[in-house]
UniProtKB/Swiss-Prot annotation:
Positions glycosylated per UniProt: N69
Name of protein: 23 kDa piroplasm membrane protein
TM segment ranges: 198-218
GO-annotated cellular components: membrane
Organism: Theileria buffeli
Keyword NADP: no
């Protein structure tokens, strides 16, 4: 009986430690995005509705270069479908914009983070910089894209111009539905989650020790 009790509590402890790792970003690589799910080697993104709207586009390959298709979607939580699995991914940090022509306007690198655990790790990994390539049509006043279209048209006419550098450096196109995260530091929410799981581990360890002691005393008394 004592043997099975130890196995049971060890299993609980391992499960708790494993659950705690859900909140640990893992290393990995960037992803490619496929809007319609037609390519097996790309990732399909389905967006959950939120109160923040914007124009989003998806990358596709053409003669070795990346271009974009534009589609209006919602911001907020998203669900990444990786292989046969689904993964929630929260975001948002900053973007960089690159003009790619009249019909394929912007290519963007968007920083993000995710709280995920296996089996997703086998199919999708985050890198330490937490970056993923995505596209976005930015606007100066967040209600009209005219301003940025005009700005980038000027940049195209004069590639060496510094027009708009100040705007590009300071522009933040939207706010995440959850609090924005800071890559370099640990957020209060993250600290709180870590404390919660550390406390859980401590409680389980204490419980295992006490239970083992009780079993030992009972076994000793029965002798």
């Amino acid at each position: 009986m004592h043997k099975f009790t130890k196995v049971f509590f060890v299993a609980i402890l391992v499960h708790t430690l494993k659950s705690g790792l859900v909140f640990t970003p893992v290393s990995g690589t960037a992803i490619d995005i496929d809007k319609d799910g037609k390519f097996a080697d790309r990732i399909t993104i389905n967006h959950f509705q939120s109160d923040m709207e914007g124009y989003k586009a998806y990358t596709y390959q053409k003669e070795g270069d990346k271009y974009v298709n534009i589609s209006k979607v919602f911001y907020g939580e998203r669900l990444l479908k990786v292989g046969g699995y689904n993964m929630k991914c929260d975001y948002v940090f900053y973007i960089k914009v690159f003009w790619k022509g009249e019909l394929a306007p912007f290519l963007i690198k968007l920083k993000y983070y995710s709280w995920s655990w296996a089996p997703y790790k086998k199919h999708f990994k985050l890198n330490p910089q937490l970056e993923w390539e995505e596209v976005f049509i930015p606007t100066i006043d967040e209600t009209s894209e005219t301003g940025y279209r005009r700005l980038f048209k000027q940049r195209m006419d004069n590639p060496f111009s510094l027009i708009g550098d100040d705007l590009l450096a300071s522009y933040k196109p939207f706010k995440a539905t959850k609090a924005e995260q800071v890559i370099a530091g640990t957020t209060e929410e993250e600290k709180s989650d870590k404390k919660k799981y550390v406390l859980m581990v401590v409680v389980v360890v204490v419980f295992v020790v006490v239970a083992s002691l009780v079993v030992f005393l009972v076994k000793f008394c029965l002798k």
